[in-house]
Amino acid sequence: MITITLPDGSRREFEGPVSVMQVAHAIGPGLAKATIAGQIDGGHLVDASDLIEHDAMLRIITPEDQEALDIIRHSCAHLVGHAVKQLYPEAKMVIGPVIADGFYYDIYSKRPFTPEDLAAIEQRMVELIAQDYHVVKHITARHDVVRLFKERGEDYKLRLIEEMGPEVTAMGIYHHQEYVDMCRGPHVPNTRFLKAFKLTRISGAYWRGDTKNEQLQRIYGTAWADKKQLEAHMQRLQDAEKRDHRKIGKVQDLFHLQEEGPGLVFWHPKGWVIWQTIENYIRRVYRNSGYGELRCPQILDVSLWQKSGHWDNYKENMFFTDSEKRTYAVKPMNCPGHVQVFNQGLHSYRDLPIRYGEFGACHRNEPSGALHGLLRVRGFTQDDGHIFCTEAQIESEVTAFHRQALQVYADFGFEDIQIKIALRPDKRLGDSLSWDKAEAALRAALSACEVEWQELPGEGAFYGPKIEYHLKDAIGRTWQLGTIQVDFMMPGRLGAEYVDERSQRCHPVMLHRAIVGSMERFIGILIEHYAGIWPTWLAPVQVVVANITDAQYEYAERVHKALLNQGFRVNTDLRNEKIGYKIREHTLQRVPYLLVVGDREKENGTVAVRTCSREDLGAMSISAFVERLQAEQVV
């Protein structure tokens, strides 16, 4: 007998091995119809057809469960393959993973796909779903899978199998009628679960993400549990399109990018004002938190990057240059430079912690296809800081950073923060004991702050685990921004030492920290978060003074000068245009305040105040308006 325990504590007994679907049928036909997969003993997910061969706790996954989304999306990727192979038999399928809010499938085809092809593929998927067919899984011996894909000419599937270790002797093959694909699963048992999907776009990609390899075509899509969720997502995409930082950046004349410098930003005067405002704010954070601001070289001999470990773990993403028979690397990270500053002179344990901060300009050789406005660039500047401390000081330093980061995010208008700990990856420096200590220190610090967090196994940096801060924006999207990482490795590799209380030389612990991360990316996120309607303290132009007629020209200039003297960013609009035209123009430019001056305002020494949201605040004295502006300043 096999006993299956359900989430409500009830039990069902079966004569022998039983599938998830059979358990669902035993409970009721309604549940069986809704069953997508199962979760065994609170662990991994399995297909509805998988057998349970021992006493177990079972949670049946239906479209109501969050876990169902990834299963639906992965199954939709296979459905893309089914449709593509029916329409374009010569195409070769590569790989189709789940991504945030959707999925993609990489395909090799000599014939470039067009928007019309995308529509045809989507229509064929709709037709296949309407056939309401079962998705059938077979565990198949490796040699049989190789034979199957050889017969079908699926060269990329064969390459994927070649990359698997010898321990993989069998794998799951999923049958969508005549189409087959390999996967760990689980997948939906029937295509009726895939109705709420939409193909969104086609882009280029490369095999294994390497530009030296052949180019592929990537079909993106999104899929949800029901039509209502899909419609809500598509509405969010429309909202995001309106907030696209590239469009707003052009309209507001903030920045541009061009072909001669892919992934490198040209900042215009208004955009640079925003940059400087944020930089000054972060500089104040450095100062108030005991950081010494420094500046390190842009290029350093590769020998330093070899010592630091970046050469072995990161060289594919680095730029290099040669001079006088020496090879230099353009820095992709700031940390080795900060260690060099620490190494100038011998430190006592009484000196620790020592905190350095830098607006460090870095360059990384990102694939051209991955570049995206300000959000993914090759040249960027980080609010990068490093803390050199003892093991006993880790918890207090991480705790202080955590509280500091939350205040910064609140000042920039982010209140919904998710905290995650990224744990040791397979490819890493150091021994397991050091990683155990580092991960325990991060958990202890967050426990001291009484916050909840999620753990991400395998997603830490190669030199240490990290805390990540994920911020939700105005339309519900989540962005990963700040990090603090424990690093027991780099100080030792680069010879950083201090003298402890026993007069012994020791390597300090190094904490890598950033609150906003890439300044470019952060500004891109802010543009989209605020939809270009900047809070007054961040706005490149905070106030425009506009006259109604030439009779107020001199008074408008006096108002302008009075506000400039208070340190505000003020322009005048003294053109011979109708005041309604001026109001519309500056409202579209999202200038927070427009001060209209006519004969009445000139006579009374006041200004008529309007906001970019078209709110009329009436007449104010200049001093009253100054007080209002000062109350809105953060830095």
Curated annotation (Swiss-Prot):
Signal peptide: none
EC number: 6.1.1.3
Ligand binding (Zn(2+)): C335, H386, H512
A single GO cellular-component term on record: cytosol
Gene3D superfamilies on file: 3.10.20.30, 3.30.54.20, Anticodon-binding domain, Bira Bifunctional Protein, Domain 2, Threonyl-trna Synthetase, Chain A, domain 2
Cofactor requirements of the protein: Zn(2+)
Domain TGS: 1-62
Catalytic activity field: tRNA(Thr) + L-threonine + ATP = L-threonyl-tRNA(Thr) + AMP + diphosphate + H(+)
Pfam hit, one: HGTP_anticodon
GO molecular function: ATP binding; metal ion binding; threonine-tRNA ligase activity; tRNA binding
Principal subcellular localisation of the protein: cytoplasm
Subcellular location: Cytoplasm
Listed CDD domains: TGS_ThrRS, ThrRS_anticodon, ThrRS_core
Region called Catalytic, residue ranges: 244-535
Record-linked InterPro entries: aa-tRNA-synt_IIb, aa-tRNA-synth_II, aa-tRNA-synth_II/BPL/LPL, Anticodon-bd, Anticodon-bd_dom_sf, Beta-grasp_dom_sf, TGS, TGS-like
Co-factor binding comment: Binds 1 zinc ion per subunit.
GO biological process, one term: threonyl-tRNA aminoacylation
Keywords: Aminoacyl-tRNA synthetase, ATP-binding, Cytoplasm, Ligase, Metal-binding, Nucleotide-binding, Protein biosynthesis, RNA-binding, tRNA-binding, Zinc
Oligomer status and interactors: Homodimer.
Function: Catalyzes the attachment of threonine to tRNA(Thr) in a two-step reaction: L-threonine is first activated by ATP to form Thr-AMP and then transferred to the acceptor end of tRNA(Thr). Also edits incorrectly charged L-seryl-tRNA(Thr).
Family according to the record: Belongs to the class-II aminoacyl-tRNA synthetase family.
NCBIfam families: thrS (TIGR00418)
Protein name: Threonine--tRNA ligase
Organism: Xylella fastidiosa (strain 9a5c)
